[in-house]
Amino acid sequence: MENIITATIFGSVILLAAAALGTAIGFSLLGGKFLESSARQPELAASLQTKMFIVAGLLDAISMIAVGIALLFIFANPFIGLLN
């Protein structure tokens, strides 16, 4: 049982780290491409900014889903029920 709890905690940590790393890389790419495109065509900056914030919200939702799954695995571990 201790092995399952330990593996679940390690899996949750890896899940959170991957979500944080992916979100950070995604935000940096999104911001860089937004600055590049708004510098190339300044008249589209307002339209691009709106779309950038929508995509940033969707990108942030991915990490929030990962946090929810990790909290599920840590506090309500479904794998412990398989032992009985």
Swiss-Prot record:
Keyword check for Transport: yes
**Superkingdom:** Bacteria
Q: Name one GO cellular component term.
A: plasma membrane
Taxon lineage? Bacteria, Pseudomonadati, Pseudomonadota, Gammaproteobacteria, Pasteurellales
Provide the assembly information: F-type ATPases have 2 components, F(1) - the catalytic core - and F(0) - the membrane proton channel. F(1) has five subunits: alpha(3), beta(3), gamma(1), delta(1), epsilon(1). F(0) has three main subunits: a(1), b(2) and c(10-14). The alpha and beta chains form an alternating ring which encloses part of the gamma chain. F(1) is attached to F(0) by a central stalk formed by the gamma and epsilon chains, while a peripheral stalk is formed by the delta and b chains.
- How does the protein's chain sit in the membrane according to the entry? Multi-pass membrane protein
* Recorded name of the encoding gene: atpE
This protein's UniProt keywords: ATP synthesis, Cell inner membrane, Cell membrane, CF(0), Hydrogen ion transport, Ion transport, Lipid-binding, Membrane, Transmembrane, Transmembrane helix, Transport
Localization annotation: Cell inner membrane
Transmembrane stretches, start-end: 9-29, 54-74
Which species is this UniProt entry from?
A: Histophilus somni (strain 2336)
Membership in a protein family:
Belongs to the ATPase C chain family.
Q: Which NCBIfam families does the UniProt record give?
A: ATP_synt_c (TIGR01260), PRK06876.1 (NF005363)
Q: Which cysteines are joined by disulfide bonds?
A: none
Q: What is this protein called?
A: ATP synthase subunit c
Q: Give the protein's biological function.
A: F(1)F(0) ATP synthase produces ATP from ADP in the presence of a proton or sodium gradient. F-type ATPases consist of two structural domains, F(1) containing the extramembraneous catalytic core and F(0) containing the membrane proton channel, linked together by a central stalk and a peripheral stalk. During catalysis, ATP synthesis in the catalytic domain of F(1) is coupled via a rotary mechanism of the central stalk subunits to proton translocation.
Instruction: Say where the protein is mainly found.
Output: membrane
SUPFAM superfamilies named in the record: F1F0 ATP synthase subunit C
Q: List site positions: Reversibly protonated during proton transport.
A: 60
Any one GO MF term held by the record is: lipid binding
